[in-house]
Amino acid sequence: MDQTTHDASAYDFTAAEARWQAAWEARNCFATADAPQGGRRKCYVLEMFPYPSGKIHMGHVRNYAIGDVIARARRAQGYDVLHPMGWDAFGLPAENAARERNVDPAKWTRDNIAAMKADLKRVGLSVDWSREFATCDPEYYGHQQKLFLDLWRAGLAYRRESAVNWDPVDMTVLANEQVIDGRGWKSGAPVEKRKLRQWFFRITDFAADLLAGLDTLENWPERVRTMQRNWIGRSEGAEFTIRLAAPCGGIESVPVYSTRPDTLFGMSFVALAPDHPLATAVAAANPEAAAFIAECQSAGTSEAAIEAAEKRGFDTGLRVVHPFDPSRTHPVWIANFVLMDYGTGAIFGCPAHDQRDLDFARKYGLDVTVVVAPKDDPGLAVGDVAFTGDGVIVNSGFLDGLDVAAAKSRAIAELESRGAGKGVVNWRLRDWGVSRQRAWGCPIPMIHCEVCGTVPVPEKDLPVRLPDDLPFDRPGNALDHHPSWKHVACPQCGAAAQRETDTFDTFVDSSWYFARFCAPHAPVPADPAATSHWMPVDHYIGGIEHAILHLLYARFFTRAMHRLGQVGVAEPFAGLFTQGMLTHESYRTEDGKWLYPEEVIRHADHATTLDGRKVIVGPIEKMSKSKRNTVDPSAVIARFGADTARWFVLSDNPPERDVEWTEAGAQGAFRYVQRLYRLARSVAADRADDVALERAEGEARKLRQATHRTIAAVTEAIDGFAFNVAIARLYELANAIAETEGRDAPGLPAARREAMSALIRLAAPIIPHVAEEANAQVSPEAGLVVNQPWPVAEPELLKRDSVTLAVQIMGKLRGTIELPPGADAETAIAAAMAEPRIAQLLEGATIVKRIHVPDRIVNFVVRP
């Protein structure tokens, strides 16, 4: 449905939305002080800031509409509200654009920001745009460089050699996830393993705190907390050395970590990570081992890739001596499923009690010895399924007869007494490598001098700015190819030196931006007074895909800044809300070409292209550019208005669930927006009477009760992020108002005006433009809706004049009765028996029992 201009009663959303957005901006309605002094409660609402790709999508609309509803409602409820917006502006897409299209990444980014900002403004967000910044602003990344130096001086940032995935064509380091089947995700070139000196943040210093802090985050989804607990990965076990039967390359023993020292007597083999020092020593003398290691390294190095890959191994020919029984030796294998950066990079395999070890042992014909048996099956034999449950230790010498927990303690004590090992707590979490060989990022403010070593850039020289003329005409890091930027004098001795040419991982940029928003123009990274007032963020809103990395890094950064005395809180986000995705059918032609929804005509039982060709309709799935099943918000807003888009993305499902975009749903939302405006015009045209609201009876009182119940219900629903429930209640109130149109009852005009005023203010956080337009019809003297207080329900009107009780006979519903709330059993039973249909059904029967559930049920148990 396109906007109807010939109907004088229709809401002209195009003109109205522009008019009210201009009014809000002119009056600075959403500006907030850095540290307000009014003593009011604060509410910091923040949606994860976007990457400036150039166009917003409907997922953005849903994400920012959720935050906007909360921000607008809290502002109306009397809170000081901070609701800022910025741009996560560094990253690979801008650099790719520079290389592929010969455009300046800064200009490309700024142009995209301008386009997306205009789009977001059209959505009508209650954002304090005076706080806007982009992470590529030198002022912002200069403060980030200052933070880095603070962390470096505190020992929380350091540089060391690290194995990396190197793309020889793009000449850059790739994350594990960017290695696909051993090749670079972009270049397709075979990836090489190299060792480079990289910068790291010592996040492991905070592992215990980060884990314990999750228990305090009661307003986070449990799913996210569980994901972070697993990522941090605390485990208790034993770290011990296993002696090689014969040294290899100067190595005499292998350190091993295990959470199951109780199963040591079930050891069948030792497995090494492909990049373990002993594996390297074996490969130096064994070409077959070297080839196997190269295969492992090219097959994908992410945990997901390793987990999915077939479990393979290489027998080194080495053997180790069992730590408890020197008469036993076991083979040493190199295995593709062992990770060097977890534990010690070596494991002992106990196939009977670990499924992965069992699969490996069966594949290569290795021993399987049961050492834990169920209490009721001491002779357990393991087939193709490992026994991983609790039980009694068997076939284990001095551990026999103990339960698993006691055996763990006894095994650790024995290792300690022999000087071979000890009990330890291990963490899956590893220090965060933040070096990236990319030019379009925040420069790391360090200088390398052959005389002084690595030294910091003096703070007076911050920010270290990116050059304006980055050379993207050759592979590799453009900063390496910019001699006048790269070559500098050492700030300590004056000798010739070189800048650090690595830039920060963009996750660093988003790990503290929420603190900067509190006072974005302050001369320090995080202003103490402002962060003291606003932090933590009360409502942080974004996708579940950020559950681990971004959210964990932000928690680390906040704790590090707290340790340094820069912020007063240890946790950045008191509340976290992860919204669902927007979904849509996908469409393609018979030759496999994907189509946009606007290129398809849906018929009753099939679909065609605009020129009549057959279209294959695919499943409803996440909107994606690759499948073209996206809906352009700009087109939706032009056709239906921003309020329709906002209403629809919040109305169909709970916001934590996915929502399917449908034409019918958009049409329904559009009709409601139009209806609200028409209702306002109708109420504005009512003739007043002399009956005060407080004395309203009959139909007027009934409408007042509906109004105040809606106020209570919508308030509760918005507090609980149940926007679809709030919208359902708003539909009901609109229906209640419409049902009274044209009726002449005492007090009804005032009750209708009260109801309409409440409906406008309750709907305003969701559909703010039409709310302002409707308010101008009904209550122009009240001023902007955005400045009006939230309606408050009157307790007296929440009480029901009557309740409906179900009347049952033998548990089957036979009728209903209306009674005053709280009617006693005698009254309820008498009323039920007086109901003609019930009396007829009871006639001739003997009532054995009368059951009364107050305000709910009357039930008669009878016999003929």
Curated annotation (Swiss-Prot):
Gene Ontology terms for molecular function: aminoacyl-tRNA deacylase activity; ATP binding; leucine-tRNA ligase activity
Catalytic activity: tRNA(Leu) + L-leucine + ATP = L-leucyl-tRNA(Leu) + AMP + diphosphate
EC nos: 6.1.1.4
Any single Pfam family the record assigns to this protein: tRNA-synt_1_2
Domain of life: Bacteria
CDD domains linked: Anticodon_Ia_Leu_BEm, LeuRS_core
Residue ranges crossing the lipid bilayer per the database entry: none
UniProt entry keywords in alphabetical sequence: Aminoacyl-tRNA synthetase, ATP-binding, Cytoplasm, Ligase, Nucleotide-binding, Protein biosynthesis
Any GO BP: leucyl-tRNA aminoacylation
Any one of the GO CC terms: cytosol
Main location: cytoplasm
Keyword Ribosomal protein: no
UniProt keyword annotation of Cytoplasm present: yes
Binding site for ATP: K625
Subcellular location: Cytoplasm
UniProt-listed HAMAP family: Leu_tRNA_synth_B
Name of this chain's protein: Leucine--tRNA ligase
High-level lineage: Bacteria, Pseudomonadati, Pseudomonadota, Alphaproteobacteria, Acetobacterales
